[in-house]
């Protein structure tokens, strides 16, 4: 396979989590919104900070910065609303981001077998190699909740 056959040119959204930048495929991004009231309640997933209400939907807020950078985000400038799941069961998830987001066109290199499950691909932008995120591996979803035993009173 030649180098040009390995590349897949796609639109991506760059997002900032602390000092690092990551990317999502643009077709996974629903919108970028200002932080709003977050509702917190008792639940079993440590990966969910709470929920926000957006366009008539309850959207889980998942701070993935701690998983990706080792530090939780102190300042949340925006929520990047993204889709995750399969075509028959798409969920929205809100990812807190600490800076501006940018839409770019980039050549993607597929993730290798030795890469972490949360890496869908790699891209190069402004001399920086950036991970393109796999939200299905990074955020909790229906398959996670279904595999956990029910709690009975």
Name each region found by the language model.
Residues 1-153:
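An acidic, low-aromatic, low-complexity terminal/linker signal
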């Amino acid at each position: 396979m030649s180098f040009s056959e390995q590349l897949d040119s796609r639109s991506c959204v760059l997002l900032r989590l602390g000092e690092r930048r990551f990317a999502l495929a643009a077709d996974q991004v629903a919108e970028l919104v200002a932080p709003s009231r977050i509702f917190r309640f008792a639940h079993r997933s440590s990966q969910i900070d709470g929920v926000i209400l957006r366009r008539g939907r309850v959207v889980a807020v998942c701070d993935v910065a701690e998983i990706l950078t080792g530090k939780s985000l102190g300042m949340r400038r925006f929520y990047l609303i993204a889709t995750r799941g399969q075509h028959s069961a798409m969920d929205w998830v809100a990812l807190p981001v600490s800076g501006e987001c940018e839409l770019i066109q980039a050549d993607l290199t597929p993730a290798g077998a030795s890469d972490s499950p949360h890496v869908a691909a790699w891209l190069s932008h402004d001399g920086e190699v950036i991970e393109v995120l796999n939200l299905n591996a990074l955020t909790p979803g229906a398959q996670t909740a279904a595999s956990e035993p029910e709690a009975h009173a």
